[in-house]
């Protein structure tokens, strides 16, 4: 995998930094694992914008990813690595010994031809999926379940991982990239290793059009809007907004706590905001 900085042959190329991976499949994706992906333009069933900054972009198919890894005891061969427009991580097409193919999140260090497996008795090896009670303390994992059998929810994006730092009774304690330490049932599954494509964070789109290809519309500052559109809007000439920064709906936007899920607070051993 290489980082390529484009030559300034035009204003649109001047700032482009690409992540080039020669190991990715050049052809079409595996059709039986594709689904239609409709665009909403950020609008709801009334036609009103409910999510800003969404619209346009290239057509995409959704790739059906196996986040549960429930084919226990059946070895699988990694056929190829592929680009997935729906996520920052790359994906791997794996062929199981019984003939079934599935997509999984591609772990770092896994390449075409490697063998992987899932289940209680799977080896402690990058790409294998096991219940966390069978994974040694200190191991790095990704694609972590929060509820047994629900499928992976934590550490799924490019370069992400969690570390198992303790095992107490029916729970393991994970340290996440954010600094949060969290208890998760030891019956939950996780995949060994970390997610690949960690260079994703180094890319530079280089021009506005590259964001538009991805379906991302411009973000306009509140201070340049009218009072009807934003709490910071209006005023004669250029203003500073006249109040502490808030969202378009008046919610403080710098350092204001918005977490309201008290039900799961008991599982958080250490907050990501604690220094």
UniProtKB/Swiss-Prot annotation:
GO terms for biological process: cytoplasmic translation. SUPFAM superfamilies: Nucleic acid-binding proteins (SSF50249), Translation proteins SH3-like domain (SSF50104). Disulfide bonds: none annotated. One of its GO terms (molecular function) is structural constituent of ribosome. InterPro entries: NA-bd_OB-fold, Rib_uL2_dom2, Ribosomal_uL2, Ribosomal_uL2_bac/org-type, Ribosomal_uL2_C, Ribosomal_uL2_CS, Ribosomal_uL2_dom3, Ribosomal_uL2_RNA-bd_dom. One of its GO terms (cellular component) is large ribosomal subunit. The keyword RNA-binding applies. Residues 28-48, 223-275 are annotated as: Disordered. Part of the 50S ribosomal subunit. Forms a bridge to the 30S subunit in the 70S ribosome. One of the primary rRNA binding proteins. Required for association of the 30S and 50S subunits to form the 70S ribosome, for tRNA binding and peptide bond formation. It has been suggested to have peptidyltransferase activity; this is somewhat controversial. Makes several contacts with the 16S rRNA in the 70S ribosome. PANTHER family: LARGE RIBOSOMAL SUBUNIT PROTEIN UL2M, RIBOSOMAL PROTEIN L2. HAMAP family: Ribosomal_uL2_B. This is Large ribosomal subunit protein uL2. It comes from Photobacterium profundum (strain SS9).
């Amino acid at each position: 995998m290489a980082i390529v900085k484009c030559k300034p042959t035009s204003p649109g190329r001047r700032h482009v930094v690409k992540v080039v991976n020669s190991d990715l499949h050049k052809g079409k994706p595996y059709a039986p694992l594709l689904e239609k992906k409709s665009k909403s333009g950020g609008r709801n069933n009334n036609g009103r914008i409910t999510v800003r900054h969404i619209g346009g972009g290239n057509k995409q198919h959704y790739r059906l990813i196996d986040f549960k890894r429930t084919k226990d005891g059946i070895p699988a061969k990694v056929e190829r690595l592929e680009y997935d427009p729906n996520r920052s991580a790359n994906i791997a097409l794996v062929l199981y010994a019984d003939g079934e193919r599935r997509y999984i999140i591609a772990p770092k260090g896994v390449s075409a031809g490697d063998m992987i497996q899932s289940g209680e008795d799977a080896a402690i090896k990058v790409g294998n999926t096991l219940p966390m009670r069978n994974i040694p303390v200190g191991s790095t994992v990704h694609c972590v379940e929060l509820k047994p059998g629900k499928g992976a929810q934590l550490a799924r994006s490019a370069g992400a991982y969690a570390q198992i730092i303790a095992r107490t009774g029916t729970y393991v304690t994970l340290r996440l990239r954010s600094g949060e330490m969290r208890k998760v049932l030891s019956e939950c599954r996780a995949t060994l290793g970390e997610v690949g494509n960690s260079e994703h964070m180094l890319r530079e789109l280089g021009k506005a059009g590259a964001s538009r290809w991805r379906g991302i519309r411009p973000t306009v500052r509140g201070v340049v809007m009218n009072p009807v559109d934003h709490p910071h809007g209006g005023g004669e000439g250029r203003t500073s907004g006249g109040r502490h920064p808030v969202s378009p709906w008046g919610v403080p936007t710098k350092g204001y706590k918005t977490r309201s899920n008290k039900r799961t607070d008991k599982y958080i051993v250490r907050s990501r905001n604690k220094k």
